[in-house]
Amino acid sequence: MRLRRLYVGLVVCSLTAVVHAQSTRPFPISDNDFYSTPSGAEVALGRALFFDKIISGNGNISCATCHHPLAGTGDGLSLSIGEGGKGLGLARDTGSGVDAVQGRIPRHTPHVFNLAAKEFSVMFHDGRLSVDDLEASGFNSPAGDQLPLGLDSVLAAQAMFPVTSSTEMAGQAGENPVANAAFEGRLAGENGVWDLLAQRLRAIPEYVVMFRDAYPEQISTADDIQFKDAANAIASFEGAAGRADNSRFDQFLRGDSQA
């Protein structure tokens, strides 16, 4: 009798543990956890821009230079080497003498995995960019009122800023018009940082076609292209390429007990 009671007790405890485990299991990640599911045309445009050095002041660095796929979307360096550096990843060099970079970026390059998820509402190491419904743009940022309307997510808003930094992508004052505008704090408006970069993109027929395909309701001619459209596309590519939700654990959460 005692053994029977012990057996029944163990069964009850086991069932209770299973029920508890199932009730506390996290929900699987789904499309609803992300800001959007971009079109293939938007992702293709974002991919092209992500790897293109044309959106840097001196045309010598792209987003992918520091957020390299082969380095886990980072660069493997404790302090990143931005504009003016040579090489990729751990082989990236600051140069020397007159060819040396003006300064290293005082932080490492963050990854882009799952940053398109809605749970991320703050960007940058110091939180200087965040979602804020009280701001006209929808974001509290160092650009203040210069940040344009129409940015799809905080990740897209983040993509507006590396191009304004002298050590990241803009270059030093005196080297190019983009760097000069950044040095003077002219981010928005005619011949501001973002407009100067948009002018470059408008002058490339292949990009005009890609922008039209990605945003047919907003863009019909080259003159319609704004840098915020480029930022939205870059964020869409980062969101699609950096989405990591198909591990064996993710599969288990979706109901695959054999994962």
What name fits each language-model region?
Residues 2-7, 20-259:
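Periplasmic c-type cytochrome electron-transfer domains
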Residues 7-17:
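Bacterial N-terminal signal peptides
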